A protein has these predicted regions:
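A short acidic/small-residue loop/turn micro-motif
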Residues: 33, 119-120
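Short beta-strand micro-motifs in enzyme catalytic cores
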Residues: 37-39, 66-68, 101-103
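Active-site beta-strand termini and strand-to-loop segments that position acidic
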Residues: 41-46, 105-108, 118
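Vicinal oxygen chelate
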Residues: 15, 70-109
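Core segments of cupin and vicinal oxygen chelate
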Residues: 2, 9-52, 80-82, 86, ...
Length: 120
């Protein structure tokens, strides 16, 4: 049996708003029909780059640090962090471990994600 990643799904208060942030952050388009209850990126495109992203409205708010989060890679870490903050992210910390550098940010609903400096 082969398993593959289909989607990242984020619980949220407003799926369209959070979906639009992530679409802009990833340089992708929000799928047609996005609304407050559900939105997606790449779900309706069979030729999409995997994985797709889904956003589902839930009644409860975020109450703790994410146990899993996306790590994005950027050629220019500082410029990408500045761009994401301009889209609505909140910078949390700049970190370094071994030869790897990254910044931790929060999306508009407080979900953690990292932007890693591409060492290539």
């Amino acid at each position: 049996m082969t398993i593959r990643l289909h989607a990242f799904t984020l619980d949220c208060a407003d799926a369209a708003v959070l979906g639009e942030f992530w679409a802009r952050a990833l340089g992708r388009e929000l799928d047609p029909g996005a609304g407050r209850e559900f939105a997606s990126i790449g779900l309706q495109d069979p030729g999409r780059p995997a994985p797709c992203w889904m956003f589902a409205r839930v009644p409860e708010g975020k109450s703790a640090k994410n146990r899993m989060h996306p790590d994005l890679m950027a050629a220019d870490l500082e410029a990408e962090v500045e761009r994401l903050v301009g889209l609505g992210a909140t910078w949390q910390a700049d970190l370094k471990l071994g030869g790897m550098r990254w910044s931790t940010l929060l999306d508009p609903e407080g979900n953690e994600f990292d932007v890693i400096a591409d060492a290539a």
